[in-house]
């Protein structure tokens, strides 16, 4: 005979959690807004302003996640309750197993919405850029920066964030000196923003024949793409614009012409680069968009003193403080902020970062 009480307890628990989220997300207001946005998107005139139409489309997706999940939880839990009652009456183990399976699926849906509670920032829903910069240490540090690049590309692919390599600067012997990735998709910035900081590698270097342990550093800085409604005042006289021949992965198609663009905002010494298009004009437009996003995020960090990242953002080693150590010989990767560890170093380096990201978001970083 099957155990009914644990299932009934789980149904009540999920119902209580759904009710809590209904209040937290202001379900009634979101449902009303969803109807308004859907009506606007059905209008034939909406595409007269493509950027507004895209913004409305993003808003609708975010609203649907909340409204549809809560609606599905309400109806789904009612259906499961009915299945459990039927299974008990008929003493039908197969029906009971179906009810349990459906309950597990509903819990996963609810957990996703609970996780979204942590995305409370005004730009968490946005696409984002991720800059990687190797620290001092020559070839070993540049190889580490390349490993970090691969790690985040893999993470982005696994989460369908369409990672796009905007720019990469090759290392002197191996690896890279720096790179920029763009991630496109809902909550890309919210998911990655706690990865800003210094990532430290400890290993026996393959570039040192003596087999000594080396410590290398690599900085990561994550910032959201901003829309045109946010005014960023940039004086053209403050910019130094250089063209150069692209190098490295992502630039192989533009090496024959100097189409890559580097823009330096002289007052803040903020540098952005773009080389992923054959057109110098398109690369320049993309780099300017990236520069505006970066300057905006740096200004937000300055205003957000409790994060203590603004001044670190100007240091040579990178942006933010040291956040995670990757000690490969001991098979241990540890987040220094949350204490979360993983012994599966290869899995993490292959992009399995969710455990670290979720813990940092839950801790309010």
UniProtKB/Swiss-Prot annotation:
Modified residue N5-methylglutamine is at which positions? 252
> Where in or outside the cell?
Cytoplasm
Keywords, comma-separated and alphabetical = Cytoplasm, Methylation, Protein biosynthesis
Q: According to the lineage, what is the superkingdom?
A: Bacteria
SMART domains (UniProt xref): PCRF
Q: How this protein is processed and modified after translation, per its record?
A: Methylated by PrmC. Methylation increases the termination efficiency of RF2.
Q: Which GO terms describe its cellular component?
A: cytoplasm
Under the GO molecular function aspect, what terms does this record hold? Answer: translation release factor activity, codon specific
- Annotated signal peptide: none
Sorted alphabetically, which InterPro entries does this protein's record hold?
A: PCRF, Pep_chain_release_fac_I, Pep_chain_release_fac_I_sf, PrfB
Q: What does the UniProt record say this protein does?
A: Peptide chain release factor 2 directs the termination of translation in response to the peptide chain termination codons UGA and UAA.
Q: Which NCBIfam families match?
A: prfB
Instruction: Report the family membership.
Output: Belongs to the prokaryotic/mitochondrial release factor family.
Protein name, as recorded: Peptide chain release factor 2
Q: Which gene encodes it?
A: prfB
């Amino acid at each position: 005979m099957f155990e009914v009480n644990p299932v009934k307890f789980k149904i009540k628990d999920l119902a209580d959690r759904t009710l809590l989220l209904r209040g937290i997300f202001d379900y009634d207001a979101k449902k009303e807004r969803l109807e308004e946005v859907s009506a606007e998107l059905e209008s034939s005139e909406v595409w007269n302003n493509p950027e507004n139409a895209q913004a409305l489309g993003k808003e609708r997706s975010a609203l649907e996640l909340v409204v549809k999940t809560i609606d599905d939880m309400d109806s789904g839990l009612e259906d499961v309750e009915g299945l459990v009652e039927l299974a008990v009456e008929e003493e039908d183990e197969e029906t009971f197993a179906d009810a349990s399976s459906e309950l597990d699926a509903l819990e996963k849906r609810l957990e996703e919405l609970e996780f979204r509670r942590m995305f409370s920032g005004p730009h968490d829903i946005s696409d984002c850029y991720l800059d990687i910069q190797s620290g001092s240490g020559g070839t070993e540090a540049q190889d580490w920066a390349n490993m970090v690049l691969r790690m985040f590309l893999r993470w982005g692919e696994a989460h369908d964030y369409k990672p796009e390599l905007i720019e990469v600067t090759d290392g002197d012997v191996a690896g890279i000196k720096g790179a920029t990735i763009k991630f496109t998709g809902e909550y890309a910035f919210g998911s990655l923003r706690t990865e800003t900081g210094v990532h430290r590698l400890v290993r026996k270097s393959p570039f040192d024949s003596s087999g000594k342990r080396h410590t290398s550093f690599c900085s990561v800085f994550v910032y959201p793409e901003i829309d045109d409604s946010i005014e960023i005042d940039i004086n053209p006289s403050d910019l130094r614009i250089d063209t150069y021949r692209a190098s490295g992965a992502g630039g192989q198609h533009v090496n024959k012409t100097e189409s890559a663009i580097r823009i330096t905002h002289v007052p803040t010494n903020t540098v952005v680069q773009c080389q992923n298009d054959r057109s110098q004009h398109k690369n320049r437009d993309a780099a300017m968009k990236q520069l505006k996003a970066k300057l905006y995020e740096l200004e937000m960090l300055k205003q957000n003193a409790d994060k203590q990242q603004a001044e670190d953002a100007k240091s040579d080693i990178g942006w933010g403080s040291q956040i995670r150590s990757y000690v490969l010989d001991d098979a241990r990767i540890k987040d220094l902020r949350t204490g979360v560890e993983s012994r599966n170093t290869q899995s993490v380096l292959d992009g399995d970062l969710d455990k670290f990201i979720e813990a940092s978001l839950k801790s309010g970083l």
